[in-house]
Amino acid sequence: LNKFADVAEDGTYTSSIESKNRRFFTMLATLVRGRLGVGASAAGATRAGLAIAVKYANIRRQFEAGEVGEESRLIDYRVHRRRLLIPLAKSYALAMFQNKLLDRFQEQTDAIMAGDWDPANPTREQDRAGREMESLAAIFKATAATHANATLQECREACGGAGYMSENLLTTFRAYVDIFTTFEGDDTILRQLVGKNLLTAYGWEVSEMSPFGMAKFVVSNIGDILTRRSGIAASVQSLSD
């Protein structure tokens, strides 16, 4: 707990990180591992629930199809496919995002363990990479938790009464992931954190532009700004519709 700061017996607070802002973000960096773990747990429960619901939809039959005596499977209905396969596609995307994040986090951890990265006094590139990692971990956790709660509820409903039976685990998974919306950070606050960090990164990018680069930036963006504020885009869209 006193890796970056300490409190003496007389109550004096000292820290090896002089900047309050950097000290704050350095302490926040310790939450990255937990948020990755919570997000990964939520994503894993979601994939397990989808596997159960999709398999059930391929087996469960109801109502006769075109041929007499043959009943349609649940998965044959378009509305049933949409309610399961769209979340399944998003789960694949989150899994790939998770793997990329874990690789990046491992690289940063290896650099710290090797002594090439001092969390208390990082280089400018390391400081920005650390903040980016914090933002990515935050949005991954928030997105995975929200997706888990919505998808597991959908899986439960897609399986009908069978989905409510504890032996089929869907209600267990649903109860398991509910806490993840606030565990390791409230999802709403985490999204606000990501928005703040994006604005900060945007400010860095603009402040480092050369005069020529700034002029080019203004010219390339002024058209879009004027279009949005004048309502031209809405008028053109109305004519197109």
Locations of the language-model features?
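Flavin-dependent oxidoreductase catalytic core characteristic
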Residues: L1-D241
